[in-house]
UniProtKB/Swiss-Prot annotation:
Function: Catalyzes both the ATP-dependent activation of exogenously supplied lipoate to lipoyl-AMP and the transfer of the activated lipoyl onto the lipoyl domains of lipoate-dependent enzymes.
Catalytic activity as recorded in UniProt: L-lysyl-[lipoyl-carrier protein] + (R)-lipoate + ATP = N(6)-[(R)-lipoyl]-L-lysyl-[lipoyl-carrier protein] + AMP + diphosphate + H(+)
Predominant cellular place of this UniProt entry's protein: cytoplasm
Metabolic or biological pathway: Protein modification; protein lipoylation via exogenous pathway; protein N(6)-(lipoyl)lysine from lipoate: step 1/2; Protein modification; protein lipoylation via exogenous pathway; protein N(6)-(lipoyl)lysine from lipoate: step 2/2
Protein name (database record): Putative lipoate-protein ligase A
Amino acid sequence: MLEAVTNPKSSLATFSKQLNGLLQAKVVVCKSVNPYFNLALENYLYENSTAKHCLLLYTNSPSVIIGRNQNPWVEANVKLCRDNFVNIIRRKSGGGTVFHDFGNLNYSVLMNREEFSHTENASIMIQALRNLGVHARLNQRHDIVLAQSQRKISGSAYKISRNRCYHHGTMLLNSDLEGVREYLRSPSTGILSKGVSSTRSPVSNTKLLKAEFIKQVISCFLLHKSHSTTTKPLSKPRASSKRLYDIEPKSVITLEQNDLLGVPSILKAVNELQSWEWTFGQTPSFKQHLESTELSVSMDISVVHGRLEKVIFSTPNATLEHELSSIPWTGLCYESGFANTFLISGIHSKEAISILKWISDSI
């Protein structure tokens, strides 16, 4: 494990040495469950790791992770996530939306660009599953599914740059599958988005213990990438075994979030991932049409960078339509309850107030 720096002057050389060890690591197991830190760590290794191949393993607290080019209001129930303190995070890679929780293990394989292969990286996970008695295979969408039921247990995505790439994914061990369904079911209607849409698939848990699966994944990875000549394939773990890894200790680095708090680029990445401008402001442009027969009104919204660009109302009442159109909508963040800003002003007609309440309930 890396040691946190308590005395910068006396520990700088030690910390630098430890950091270099991290960047040369073959396997990194992060004990943090902070999704912002874990994704920032992944990006840090992606940009700085000098290892030919590096495996990163981590678990996140309950979070909805959307792809780089996706619309959170289409992919998730944003209000429910916020009500239940479930993080919504836009990652750097493409692909679809996934739900993370404590029953889920996330993996990321970092490598040189020319060595990228969906099949090769998935085969490592499949072998680890088979070693534990779970029969799985790779389908045509490059998802790992249970061989018998064909239910998805692992989805993946990737990011490729000029020289490096990473292939990362999830593994459903004992996740809250009802949470997956609830948080990834958007209540929004009438949205026409330029963003990438997720493909929904039936999912299932492997019901494996996390420690046992981690152990198998590391062993299979090291063998497959020829990092270790002394590591042997692991048999099914004994229930009495208390050791996490039966491999060379120098092959694996474990770390906590506090170990890297002094790395500026990681802190910067965490702040970016937490920002509204990144999570929602990076949403591809979209339009939404809403209408209420009860109130005899329709509303067309254009949203750019997560903010209202144009709002057009249509209602038989010309005076009401003018009143609604006169409200300064442009530039407001597209958020649940954005119309409440004007409800509290107390200067609108009764009809306009009813419509503003309808808008708040509809977004």
